[in-house]
């Protein structure tokens, strides 16, 4: 986006394969949560050259509207996940980016 029309936004989309068994639980205040790791692999063009892109991204889905859809997520499911990213502290105190899903779509 041009400097003269700068909007701050946080949108992130990633296609990948579920690489960890989803963890599903309900918080004490009744909000449903599902967490898993999405593994992405692709070929991207950068500076006129092809390069492999690869990452593992933790995904957090929160809200009762996701309960039914997340029941079908298993290791090996291919998904498109759209949401925003935020930093979380891991158990050992390191910062880690997490994709907070707002939409998911199964890819055949």
From Swiss-Prot:
Look up keyword DNA-binding and say if it applies: yes
Residues in domain SSB? 8-108
Which Gene3D superfamilies does the record match to this protein? Answer: Nucleic acid-binding proteins
MF terms per GO, please? single-stranded DNA binding
The stretch of residues making up the signal peptide is none
What keywords tag this UniProt record?
DNA replication, DNA-binding, Primosome
**Key word Nucleotide-binding present:** no
Q: Which cysteines are joined by disulfide bonds?
A: none
Q: Which InterPro entries match?
A: NA-bd_OB-fold, Primosome_PriB/ssb, Prisomal_replication_PriB
One GO term under biological process is: DNA replication, synthesis of primer
Which Pfam family name is an example for this entry? Answer: SSB_1
Mention any one GO cellular component term assigned to this protein in its UniProt record. Answer: primosome complex
Query: Family, per the entry?
Result: Belongs to the PriB family.
Subunit relationships: Homodimer. Interacts with PriA and DnaT. Component of the replication restart primosome. Primosome assembly occurs via a 'hand-off' mechanism. PriA binds to replication forks, subsequently PriB then DnaT bind; DnaT then displaces ssDNA to generate the helicase loading substrate.
Please describe what this protein does.
Involved in the restart of stalled replication forks, which reloads the replicative helicase on sites other than the origin of replication; the PriA-PriB pathway is the major replication restart pathway. During primosome assembly it facilitates complex formation between PriA and DnaT on DNA; stabilizes PriA on DNA. Stimulates the DNA unwinding activity of PriA helicase.
Q: Which HAMAP family match?
A: PriB (MF_00720)
Can you name this protein? Answer: Replication restart protein PriB
Please name the source species.
Pasteurella multocida (strain Pm70)
Q: What is the lineage of its organism?
A: Bacteria, Pseudomonadati, Pseudomonadota, Gammaproteobacteria, Pasteurellales
């Amino acid at each position: 986006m041009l400097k003269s029309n700068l909007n701050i936004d946080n949108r992130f989309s990633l296609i990948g394969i579920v690489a960890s068994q989803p963890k599903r639980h309900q918080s004490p205040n009744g909000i449903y949560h599902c967490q898993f790791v999405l593994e992405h692999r692709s070929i991207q063009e950068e500076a006129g050259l092809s390069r492999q892109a690869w990452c593992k991204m933790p995904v957090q889905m929160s809200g009762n509207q996701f309960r039914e859809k997340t029941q079908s997520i298993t290791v090996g499911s291919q998904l498109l996940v759209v949401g925003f990213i935020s930093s979380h502290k891991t158990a050992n105190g390191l910062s880690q980016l997490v994709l907070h899903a707002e939409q998911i779509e199964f890819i055949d």
